[in-house]
C-alpha cells in the first residue's frame, strides 16, 4: 500500500531520477558538465582570492620591471 502511495506522489528526487539518472548517456553528460562547471567555478574563486590577497606584490603591479633605462 505504501509503495503505491509513493509512486503516485512523486517528489523532487524521483523527478531528478527520471530526468537525469534513468539513462546512462544522460547521466554521464550530466556528470561531465557538472565537473566542468565546478572546475571553472573553483578556478575563478581561487584566482580572485589570490589576486585580492596579492595586490601590489605581483609582477604586473610593479611598473619598473621590464623597462629599459632611458639614456640621457
Swiss-Prot record:
Matches recorded under PANTHER family: CYTOCHROME B-C1 COMPLEX SUBUNIT 9, UBIQUINOL-CYTOCHROME C REDUCTASE COMPLEX, SUBUNIT X
Keywords of this entry: Electron transport, Membrane, Mitochondrion, Mitochondrion inner membrane, Respiratory chain, Transmembrane, Transmembrane helix, Transport
GO terms of biological process kind: mitochondrial electron transport, ubiquinol to cytochrome c
Protein name, entry field: Cytochrome b-c1 complex subunit 9
Chain ranges passing through the membrane: 28-53
Family under the similarity heading: Belongs to the UQCR10/QCR9 family.
Pfam families given in the database record: UCR_UQCRX_QCR9
Organism of derivation: Solanum tuberosum (Potato)
Self-association and partners: Component of the ubiquinol-cytochrome c oxidoreductase (cytochrome b-c1 complex, complex III, CIII), a multisubunit enzyme composed of 3 respiratory subunits cytochrome b, cytochrome c1 and Rieske protein, 2 core protein subunits, and additional low-molecular weight protein subunits. The complex exists as an obligatory dimer and forms supercomplexes (SCs) in the inner mitochondrial membrane with cytochrome c oxidase (complex IV, CIV).
Superkingdom to which the source organism belongs: Eukaryota
Topological domain spans for side Mitochondrial matrix: 1-27
GO CC annotation: mitochondrial inner membrane; respiratory chain complex III
InterPro entries: QCR9 (IPR008027), QCR9_sf (IPR036656)
Described purpose of this protein according to its UniProt entry: Component of the ubiquinol-cytochrome c oxidoreductase, a multisubunit transmembrane complex that is part of the mitochondrial electron transport chain which drives oxidative phosphorylation.
Annotated Gene3D superfamilies: Cytochrome b-c1 complex subunit 9 (1.20.5.260)
Topology feature Mitochondrial intermembrane, residues: 54-72
Tagged with keyword Aminoacyl-tRNA synthetase: no
Membrane disposition: Single-pass membrane protein
SUPFAM superfamilies: Subunit X (non-heme 7 kDa protein) of cytochrome bc1 complex (Ubiquinol-cytochrome c reductase)
Subcellular compartments: Mitochondrion inner membrane
